[in-house]
Amino acid sequence: MGLIKLLDTKFYPDYKNNWDDDIFRDKILKNIRKNDVVLDLGAGAGIIPQMDFRKFCDRVYGIDPDPRVENNPYLFEGVEAFGEDVPYPDNFFDVVFADNVLEHLSAPETVLNEVYRVLKPGGIFLGKTPNKFHYMPLISRLTPTSFHKWYNQLRGRDAEDTFPTCYLINCSKDFHQLCKESSLLPIEVDLIEGRPEYLRMFVLTYVFGILYQRIVSSVNFLRNFRILLIGVAQKPID
């Protein structure tokens, strides 16, 4: 780990674990107001402190098929439910966000229809997900979930927090198209490459990841090969 720490210090001195969630948190905070009612779509057990917005809005609700959501400490209410059938009334939320959820959806169009339904007019949807043209999702699609669980355990992540992936709304084009089909208005899609987390276990792979990050970050026409996709859409005001 000594050489890896040295590479961390030299190339990514300002990075820390879950740097992508720090970026997403900042994006969410720019869209949350003090009196907002917010839905964390795919809230899970509450293992990511960056997704705690209790001090910045009125209430945060959460849904997830994982029953641990009911004990998520960041939520006013956590409900075991799927995104295809959100258990809340029409026009209920000011903001809906999904952190590392979109890649797991087998029917993203259905989920976005539900997002549209529960958002108030003018409400905002934000999603953070891997870009499917990056090498990590490409490898993921060629390997079974059992491999993902094993590799994530090597990285220090619990197997129960690794889920099957579909990558059906994981590029800029798909995000724009599926949002429009659900009557949501796409506002922006950011594509970002950062510290290569999945390659940091070994020096040789880490060096490759650093070179890749430098290239795709500096050449704009390679932006579609960056790892992180953050999409923002809005429910039109009637």
Where are each of the predicted segments found?
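Conserved N-terminal segment of class I S-adenosyl-L-methionine
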Residues: 1-89, 95-97, 191, 210, ...
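Helix-to-beta-strand junctions that scaffold the AdoMet/dcAdoMet cofactor pocket
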Residues: 33, 105-106, 119-121
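Short glycine-centered segments of the SAM/dcSAM-binding site in methyltransferase folds
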Residues: 37, 122-124
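Glycine-rich, phosphate-binding/catalytic loops in enzymes
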Residues: 54-58, 78, 113-118, 142-145
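Active-site micro-motifs of SAM-dependent methyltransferase domains
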Residues: 85, 103, 134
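A short SAM/SAH-binding and catalytic strip from SAM-dependent methyltransferases
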Residues: 95-106
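S-adenosyl-L-methionine-dependent methyltransferase catalytic module, highlighting the catalytic core
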Residues: 106-114, 124-237
